[in-house]
């Protein structure tokens, strides 16, 4: 095995070391990893034509996840922060639910409901969100006859999780601190 590693280019070995470090951090107990910042080389995503928010707007985001999500610049910064922590699935699920509610066609709604369920809700889903068993069961029952409200309970649980967990971490992050400079 060592001969195989020695033959790899230096950049591959460096990348492997970075991944090993990140995985080590992720495998730590959550309490000890709360304030760790994982290095993230990309700059925060910024919408093409979004204006930089005022200091007053940015300060409001500390108190209101709604205001943060409604501001395109804030949304992009929050999304970049979550990506840096490998935890963007909650925001992606929330956005998928918002888009799902806008679907008018019952056929398209059923297709999208299945896609959301398979991507975020079912056990071992690629981007499985952290919801309790009761919420999962209710959501599954709602999908027998999909409606715009099929994911409401799960979406509310994930929103509350982002509000109580992700938002405070975002406000303590370098992403947010850069915005209030």
Swiss-Prot record:
CDD domains: RGS_RGS5. Transmembrane segments: none annotated. GO terms for molecular function: GTPase activator activity. This is Regulator of G-protein signaling 5. Expressed in heart and muscle. GO terms for biological process: G protein-coupled receptor signaling pathway; negative regulation of signal transduction; negative regulation of vascular associated smooth muscle cell proliferation. Pfam families: RGS. It is found in: Cytoplasm; Membrane. The gene is Rgs5. It comes from Mus musculus. InterPro entries: RGS, RGS_RGS5, RGS_sf, RGS_subdom1/3, RGS_subdomain_2. Inhibits signal transduction by increasing the GTPase activity of G protein alpha subunits thereby driving them into their inactive GDP-bound form. Binds to G(i)-alpha and G(o)-alpha, but not to G(s)-alpha. Residues 64-180 form the RGS domain. The keyword Membrane applies. One of its GO terms (cellular component) is cytosol. Keywords: Cytoplasm, Membrane, Signal transduction inhibitor.
């Amino acid at each position: 095995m060592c001969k195989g590693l020695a033959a790899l280019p230096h950049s591959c070995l460096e990348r492997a070391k970075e991944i090993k470090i990140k995985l080590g951090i992720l495998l730590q107990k959550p309490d000890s990893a709360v304030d760790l910042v994982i290095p993230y080389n990309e700059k925060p995503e910024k919408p093409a034509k979004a204006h930089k928010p005022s200091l007053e707007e940015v300060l409001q985001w500390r108190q209101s996840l709604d205001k943060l999500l409604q501001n395109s610049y804030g949304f992009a910064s929050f999304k970049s922060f979550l990506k840096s922590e490998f935890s963007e699935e909650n925001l992606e699920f929330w956005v998928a639910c918002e888009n799902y509610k806008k679907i008018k066609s019952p056929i398209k709604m059923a297709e999208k409901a299945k896609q959301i369920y398979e991507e975020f809700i079912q056990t071992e889903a690629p981007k499985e969100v952290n919801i309790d068993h009761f919420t999962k069961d209710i959501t599954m029952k709602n999908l027998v006859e999909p409606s715009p409200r099929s994911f409401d309970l799960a979406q509310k649980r994930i929103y509350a999780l982002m509000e109580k967990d992700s938002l405070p971490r975002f406000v303590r992050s370098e992403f947010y601190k850069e915005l209030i400079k």
